[in-house]
Amino acid sequence: MSVQLTPHFGNVQAHYDLSDDFFRLFLDPTQTYSCAYFERDDMTLQEAQIAKIDLALGKLNLEPGMTLLDIGCGWGATMRRAIEKYDVNVVGLTLSENQAGHVQKMFDQMDTPRSRRVLLEGWEKFDEPVDRIVSIGAFEHFGHQRYHHFFEVTHRTLPADGKMLLHTIVRPTFKEGREKGLTLTHELVHFTKFILAEIFPGGWLPSIPTVHEYAEKVGFRVTAVQSLQLHYARTLDMWATALEANKDQAIAIQSQTVYDRYMKYLTGCAKLFRQGYTDVDQFTLEK
């Protein structure tokens, strides 16, 4: 039976189309809105974000002239880096109008013979062959019911030697949680409800076995998994510190309510990563 899937435009735009100026108050200059990788302890946030992008792209065996699909491309930092470092063609997918506009301007200013496109659409509608796929911090938005379709689409899009790098926040299974001594507290339940209602509507965190199960079901092999758990705690700490330092501007751009909401989100999530209630992993998938 054919299933017609419509991308979650509303859920994504509710978060990412808040205001580019607001996000600039706490993100680094590349506007990378995902876990950084502090390869060295003395790295700035910007250096650590580029290190994370390099870590992801370095797992894809990119070669000049290949076409890289970036699913959930954000403000385009990964595609820019891929063009500059690996000399590839890029296609970015985003459901955010603000992000699509920002990326298009960036592309227009780049001096490269490589093709570069940003599409205001989801992976659900994408049907072009590409050589490699990267997806950083987008899988969390898809919802459990779409996992099978996501892996089907990405597997079909790639060639026989294709690779995908999937970077996503994950949660422990109940068994893993018990083994770690994690308990389900009222505080955790309330914070989770807050995140799903006010920050990432429609969001859902997979477990590591879930990613394996759905990826392998369509023919992918998961050849590597790398955790960046404490790197995300540090990233969130730095975002919260930057937002707090720009409190007056944040309130002027948005409101006291939005500022308070984001401080609660950033500090609360940092705590979850430190305690092990959440993790973030890079999965290398091969056909």
Curated annotation (Swiss-Prot):
GO terms for cellular component: cytoplasm. Regulated by PknF. Inhibited by S-adenosyl-N-decyl-aminoethyl (SADAE), thiacetazone (TAC) and dioctylamine. It is found in: Cytoplasm. It catalyses: a 1-acyl-2-(9Z)-enoyl-sn-glycero-3-phospholipid + S-adenosyl-L-methionine = a 1-acyl-2-(9-cyclopronane)-acyl-sn-glycero-3-phospholipid + S-adenosyl-L-homocysteine + H(+). Pathway: Lipid metabolism; mycolic acid biosynthesis. Gene3D superfamilies: Vaccinia Virus protein VP39 (3.40.50.150). Its EC number is 2.1.1.79. It holds the Pfam family CMAS. Changing residue 168 to A: Loss of phosphorylation. The active site is at residue 269. The modification Phosphothreonine is found at residues 168, 183. GO terms for biological process: lipid biosynthetic process; methylation; mycolic acid biosynthetic process; S-adenosylmethionine metabolic process; symbiont-mediated evasion of host immune response; symbiont-mediated perturbation of host innate immune response. Keywords: Acetylation, Cytoplasm, Lipid biosynthesis, Lipid metabolism, Methyltransferase, Phosphoprotein, S-adenosyl-L-methionine, Transferase. Transmembrane segments: none annotated. Homodimer. Belongs to the CFA/CMAS family. Was identified as a high-confidence drug target. This is Cyclopropane mycolic acid synthase 3. It comes from Mycobacterium tuberculosis (strain ATCC 25618 / H37Rv). The gene is pcaA.
